[in-house]
Amino acid sequence: MRRYEVNIVLNPNLDQSQLALEKEIIQRALENYGARVEKVEELGLRRLAYPIAKDPQGYFLWYQVEMPEDRVNDLARELRIRDNVRRVMVVKSQEPFLANA
């Protein structure tokens, strides 16, 4: 198991119920691929450096997870096929991973 950071940019035009549904689907996908979520941060609506799908903004989510190495690409692929997911980036965590005591 390795530690990863999962960065996701969602469609900025989602209402609260759609946003909650997308977060639930993302959480389920992480669990289905054997990820143990350690930390979640909702960075909210942010301006993008360049428009994605003609939107100058995106709703940002950041997850810190521990998961099997061989499942990372499958997870990223599943998240990318969602219509409301604009971008997905999964990177190995650089900082020491400390569990809450």
UniProtKB/Swiss-Prot annotation:
Check the record and name the InterPro entries matching this protein: Ribosomal_bS6, Ribosomal_bS6_CS, Ribosomal_bS6_sf, Ribosomal_S6_plastid/chlpt, Transl_elong_EF1B/ribsomal_bS6
* Keywords assigned: Ribonucleoprotein, Ribosomal protein, RNA-binding, rRNA-binding
Signal sequence region: none
Lineage, top-rank taxon, reads Bacteria
Name the Gene Ontology biological process terms. translation
GO CC terms of this entry: cytoplasm; ribonucleoprotein complex; ribosome
Provide an example Pfam family for this protein: Ribosomal_S6
PROSITE patterns attached here? RIBOSOMAL_S6
Gene Ontology MF, one: structural constituent of ribosome
Membership in a protein family: Belongs to the bacterial ribosomal protein bS6 family.
NCBIfam families hit by this protein: S6
Oligomeric state and interaction partners are given as: Part of the 30S ribosomal subunit. Forms a tight heterodimer with protein bS18.
Q: What does this protein do?
A: Located on the outer edge of the platform on the body of the 30S subunit.
**What name does this protein carry?**
Small ribosomal subunit protein bS6
